[in-house]
């Protein structure tokens, strides 16, 4: 189970995936998500300034946030993310070198995987949680099927998770879910409609809690 000095990622505690187009919006996005109850936030490193944004959010927002770096592709990126203050690491695929760096630094790793072989490999290598990606096409039934022979592995469906299916993923046995564009909506962000983002975050938190 993912543990950290500030706490741990709880079951059914949704993880927001933030992909930034504008560095200046990082704090506002994070603040709006936090106001809606989402305290675990992953900044995808697809933007070259994502680590700078993560550090900025850490400086300016309350300490009850758990901020991580996503799309970590190798050990070098993992070390850079940790140096920038990332409190957990997320990979899009099973990348053992990233898991090793995270474990050595005492930083939780959500390792990407899809097939049962990859899922078991990530877990045995030391991943704290296993991110099942892409999960949308496979659906909740896939999570249930995988957990049949592999019970006890904390799975985090990612990719294609939305308000319509997040409860079903959890009912199928997922530990929690990670949510990208269906939460951090590009149109909402473009228009800077932060109250709308907060309300959407609240809806996801409620859906996860009551599923």
Sequence positions of predicted segments:
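Histidine/lysine/aspartate-rich catalytic loop segments that bind and position anionic ligands
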Residues: 88, 92-137
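Conserved N-terminal glycine/acidic-rich loop preference
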Residues: 16, 81, 119, 135, ...
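Shared catalytic-loop signature of beta/alpha-barrel
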Residues: 121, 142-144, 148-156
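Short, charged, surface-exposed secondary-structure boundary motifs
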Residues: 98-102, 120-125, 140-143, 166-167, ...
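Glycine-rich phosphate-binding active-site loops on the catalytic face of alpha/beta enzymes
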Residues: 88-98, 132-140, 172-194
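Hydrophobic faces of well-ordered beta-strands that scaffold small-molecule active sites
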Residues: 13-18, 41-43, 67-70, 89-90, ...
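Conserved N-terminal beta1-alpha1 strand-loop-helix module at the mouth
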Residues: 1-85, 94, 104, 152, ...
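Short, ordered loop/turn segments at secondary-structure junctions
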Residues: 45-48, 72, 94-96, 114-115, ...
């Amino acid at each position: 189970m993912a543990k950290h000095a500030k706490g741990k990622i709880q079951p059914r505690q949704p993880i927001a995936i933030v992909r930034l187009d504008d560095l200046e919006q990082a704090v506002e996005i994070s603040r709006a998500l936090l106001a809606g109850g989402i305290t675990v936030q992953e900044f995808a490193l697809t933007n070259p300034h994502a680590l700078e944004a993560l550090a900025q959010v850490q400086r300016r927002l309350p300490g009850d946030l758990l901020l991580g770096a996503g799309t970590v592709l190798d050990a070098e990126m993992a070390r850079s993310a940790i140096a920038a203050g990332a409190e957990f690491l997320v990979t899009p695929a099973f990348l053992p070198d990233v898991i090793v760096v995270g474990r050595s630094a005492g930083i939780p790793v959500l390792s990407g995987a899809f097939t049962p072989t990859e899922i078991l490999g990530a877990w045995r290598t030391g991943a704290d949680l296993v991110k099942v990606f892409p999960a949308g096409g496979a659906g909740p039934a896939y999570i249930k099927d995988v957990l049949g022979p592999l019970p006890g592995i904390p799975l985090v469906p990612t990719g294609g998770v939305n308000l319509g299916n997040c409860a079903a993923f959890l009912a199928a046995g997922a530990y929690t879910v990670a949510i990208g564009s269906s939460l951090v909506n590009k149109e909402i962000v473009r228009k800077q409609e932060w109250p709308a983002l907060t309300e959407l975050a609240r809806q996801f938190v409620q859906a996860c809690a009551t599923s």
